[in-house]
Amino acid sequence: MPFRPLLTALVERVPGAQGAIVADWEGESVDQVGIMDDYDLKVIGAHKGVILHSMREVVDRLGDDELKEIVITTKQAQTVIMPVTEDYYLVLTLDRSDMLGRALLEARRCIQALYKEIV
């Protein structure tokens, strides 16, 4: 699956992007691109998978429809978590001071392209 070009385009299009990773349901990296350390990006991807799993359980218990995206904002960074399918998800990390709206727009575009590659 050619994920690297899609992830590269995502990171290049989002000002302040530090990295993007596609991981499977176990939190294992399928592919990743970033200016941050590869190991750190893999750890972030795995941890955000745990958050995604927990949020999916909450959404299911509430009887709501499927979870589309999660945004985590800290003092220094923002992280976007988006499911691609039931088994794969995208994590995008970026600087806190940069444009979250642009990041969400580009991540949604990337999700559509990733979905086409996976399904």
Describe the predicted segments one by one:
Residues 1-119:
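Non-catalytic interaction/Regulatory regions outside core domains
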